[in-house]
Regions:
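A short, N-terminal "cap"/entry segment at the start of jelly-roll beta-barrel domains
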Residues: 1-71, 164-176
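Conserved short histidine dyad/triad with adjacent acidic residue
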Residues: 56-63, 76-91, 130
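Short, solvent-exposed loop/turn segments that connect beta-strands within catalytic domains
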Residues: 66, 111-115, 142
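Short, conserved beta-strand element in jelly-roll/cupin
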Residues: 72, 77-82, 90-110, 149-152
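A structural connector/turn signal
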Residues: 75, 85, 94, 115, ...
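Short beta-strand His + acidic residue motifs that chelate non-heme Fe in jelly-roll/DSBH
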Residues: 86-89, 106-107, 128, 134-140, ...
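A short hydrophobic beta-strand segment most commonly corresponding to one strand
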Residues: 96-98, 127, 141-160
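Short acidic-glycine-tyrosine-enriched beta hairpin
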Residues: 110-130
Length: 176
């Protein structure tokens, strides 16, 4: 007989494992790319698709019924075509970019505009600390797929470094 060494959270006490398996498995083939997941994704140069698996990530779309419920972190897969990326931003939690396929140019930036960039390939990552301006651009010849994790179950939407983007950072949520 197996012994669970840690207690289940209250909402899973007594729930059959068949139901747990159904609720906590996410399959890429069942995910629809969300090309409007972020406010900056409306702008040429920042177009990308989010595939949400665990929670909403930095999109703010916390009511998505197709995702695995998030408690302490989120996990998404991003698809970015050549010449696209995202706007410089910060988060109130750590954010990780982990490249699965293709190449991604990631950057960190200070408040004076000084920017350092490095290229990540498959199975390489960057962990972006809280409050550090960061972002990415696909400057390669092919598309990139990468995993994004945020260190909170319901993080805030992106804290864009650009004042105008920041003022309207939640506008994409009202359009839904």
């Amino acid at each position: 007989m197996s012994v669970a060494r840690h207690p289940r959270p209250p909402e899973l006490v007594g729930v059959p494992i068949e139901e747990i398996m159904q609720k906590f498995v996410g399959r890429f083939r069942e995910k629809k790319p969300d090309w409007a997941a972020f406010e900056d994704a409306k702008i040429e140069g920042y177009k990308r698709a989010q595939h949400r698996f665990i929670g909403a990530g930095g999109s703010g779309k916390h009511g998505d019924p197709t995702v695995i419920p998030a408690k302490n972190f989120t996990l998404s897969i991003m698809y970015v075509e050549p010449g696209q990326g995202n706007a410089a931003h910060t988060h109130e939690v750590e954010e990780v970019f982990f490249v699965l396929q293709g190449f991604l140019d990631v950057f960190v930036e200070d408040e004076t505009g000084k920017r350092l960039t490095t290229r990540l390939g498959p199975w390489e990552c960057i962990s972006c600390p809280v409050g550090v301006i960061h972002g990415y651009q696909n400057d390669s010849l092919g598309p990139v797929y990468f995993q994004v994790m945020l260190g909170r179950g319901k993080p805030e939407t992106m804290g864009y470094a650009d004042d105008e983007l920041y003022k309207h950072r939640d506008a994409h949520l009202k359009a839904v």
